[in-house]
A protein has these predicted regions:
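Alpha-helical membrane-anchoring segments
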Residues: 2-293
């Protein structure tokens, strides 16, 4: 019997991982929960008492929900429901300044509420949904950069060079006088122009959105999936090395690893846990301070 069109489209991201599907989904969810709960805490530590009473409540809810998901399997669904609710309140209370990755995290939580990794049919649907979520986010990240127009001529990167993290890693792409001119601007009305003649910076700017748009369909096609996965992970690592949006980077890298052959999540969750420990020690002052968001 021929599958309906929507089922054939959903199956495009399938792999040869039926035997390890449940295990890799559980490992992904464990890493994801660690990231989300750590994000609540690491955001609160430097601003303790300044984020409002509602944030204290959300911090408590996310901590209890995360512990329940990790420690008591039968509380998985209510735990993810609590995390989703906490994120929805966070998005509502901080709109429009809330980070885009909070929406992505909310979608993942809602999928986990609706679908169970230990059910063969539901685990297949959850894995497909998570993979398509990664493809859609990657593709439309590139489309958004193109549509807004601030990457084609490099304006966004030039504007971002006003921050220390961008200057440290990308300052070498511009002559010293251009870099000094950009550093003097503060993003106020009348500042500019935010355009430069550096061909290297233009290649980096346009290469970013082009890579995002190209890698997304390459992840779907099995013949190019492995190469696309490596390329996407390197792209995300490069972007986050500059932008320092580490929580989005960890979540999205975990989503991308769902395209890998076999069960890579079981090992990746320990790497995620180690990275979060390092970030926590940095924020607590035990390790040298690192700027991240």
């Amino acid at each position: 019997m021929q599958q309906p069109p929507h089922a054939r489209i959903a199956a495009l991201v399938d792999g040869d991982d039926a035997a390890v599907r449940a295990r890799r989904l559980r490992a992904f969810e464990q890493a994801f929960v660690l990231i989300v709960v750590a994000e609540y805490w690491l955001r609160a530590i430097p601003k303790w008492g300044l984020l409002g009473r509602h944030y204290d409540v959300l911090l408590g809810v996310s901590t209890v929900a995360g512990a329940a998901i990790l420690a008591v399997p039968r509380l998985r669904r209510p735990g993810f429901a609590a995390l989703a609710l906490a994120h929805l309140v966070l998005l509502w209370s901080e709109f429009p300044s809330s980070g885009n990755h909070a929406y992505l995290e909310t979608y993942v939580c809602l999928l986990a509420v609706l679908l169970r990794p230990d059910d063969p049919d539901e685990s297949l649907l959850e894995l497909r949904a998570l993979r398509w979520l990664a493809v859609i986010v990657l593709f439309f990240s590139g489309v958004q950069k193109l549509a807004h127009g601030y990457w084609v001529n490099g304006e966004y990167l030039v504007f971002s060079l006003g921050s220390e993290t961008y200057r440290t890693l990308l300052g070498w792409t511009l002559p010293a006088d251009e870099l000094a001119r950009i550093a003097r601007m503060s993003g106020e009305v009348g500042d500019g122009p935010y355009r430069v003649a550096s061909m290297l910076l233009l290649v980096l700017a346009n290469g970013t959105w082009l890579a995002e748009i190209a890698l997304a369909p390459a992840l779907v096609w099995r013949r190019t999936r492995t190469v696309a996965l490596v390329g996407a992970l390197l792209l995300i690592a490069g972007i986050e090395l500059v932008a320092r949006e580490v929580f989005f980077g960890l979540v999205f890298a975990s989503l991308l690893l769902l395209f890998a052959h076999g069960d890579r999540q079981s090992a990746a969750r320990w790497l995620v846990a180690a990275a979060l420990v390092v970030l926590a020690l940095s924020r607590l002052g035990v390790l040298p301070e690192v700027t991240y968001y």
